[in-house]
């Protein structure tokens, strides 16, 4: 099929419908299995890194059958992201939001999930959800680590170039999650960091 591209945009093409449908038909995904011990091991490895003491401890569980090109391996199934998160006792993941819907399955630990000002306590084997673009924060209030699975429709939104993230809370931190947009991902506050920040706030109030 001949076509002209006088303006010189090499990524802009016209193709025959048959070729288009060849691209639409993808390979099916194979069944996958991820051992819980391996997931925990990955989280513990992050925990050993001193640079991660105040970072979000998070591993993504991916299927290499999912996605194409640069989006290959961004989901556990087409459209869905799955990860596992570790929060230490006394730590807080401060308020943030994203336009992906989130589902959480608590494996270990106790604490609180705050969504738009409403506080919900959690314990092992609870299932919790957070609507899209809702501010939410986590606090591990128990004496054991919090371990939880997190499932988002993030992979679908990323593929559509429609994923937005605000972290930490503040309109200046809203990011369109595409290349060239700076993202902020590290937002777990260690207890001692929280106290330091609180002291700074008191000093500001006294000025």
From Swiss-Prot:
The keyword Secreted does not apply. Its EC number is 1.13.11.64. Pfam families: Cupin_2 (PF07883). It catalyses: 5-nitrosalicylate + O2 = 2-oxo-3-(5-oxofuran-2-ylidene)propanoate + nitrite + H(+). One of its GO terms (molecular function) is dioxygenase activity. Keywords: Dioxygenase, Oxidoreductase. The keyword Manganese does not apply. Residues 85-151 form the Cupin type-2 domain. It comes from the Bacteria. Coiled coil: none annotated. Dioxygenase that catalyzes the cleavage of the aromatic ring of 5-nitrosalicylate (5NSA) without prior removal of the nitro group in biodegradation of 5-nitroanthranilate. This is 5-nitrosalicylic acid 1,2-dioxygenase. The gene is naaB.
């Amino acid at each position: 099929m001949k076509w002209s591209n006088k303006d010189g945009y090499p990524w802009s093409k016209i193709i025959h419908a048959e070729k288009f449908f060849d691209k639409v038909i993808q390979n099916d995904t194979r069944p996958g299995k991820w051992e819980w011990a391996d997931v925990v091991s990955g989280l513990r490895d992050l925990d050993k890194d001193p640079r991660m003491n105040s970072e979000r401890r998070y591993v993504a569980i991916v299927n290499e059958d999912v996605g194409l090109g640069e989006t290959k391996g961004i989901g556990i199934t087409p459209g869905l992201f799955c990860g596992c998160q570790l929060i230490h006792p006394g730590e807080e993941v401060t308020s943030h939001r994203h336009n992906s819907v989130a589902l959480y399955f608590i494996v270990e630990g106790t604490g609180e999930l705050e969504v738009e000002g409403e506080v919900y306590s959690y314990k092992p084997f609870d299932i919790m959800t957070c609507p899209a673009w809702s501010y939410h924060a986590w606090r591990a209030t128990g004496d054991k680590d919090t371990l939880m699975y997190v499932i988002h429709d993030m992979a679908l939104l990323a593929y559509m170039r429609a994923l937005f993230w605000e972290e930490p809370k503040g309109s200046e931190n809203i990011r369109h999650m595409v290349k060239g947009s700076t993202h902020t991902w590290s937002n777990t506050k260690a207890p001692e960091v929280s106290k330091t920040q609180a002291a700074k706030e008191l000093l500001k109030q006294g000025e």
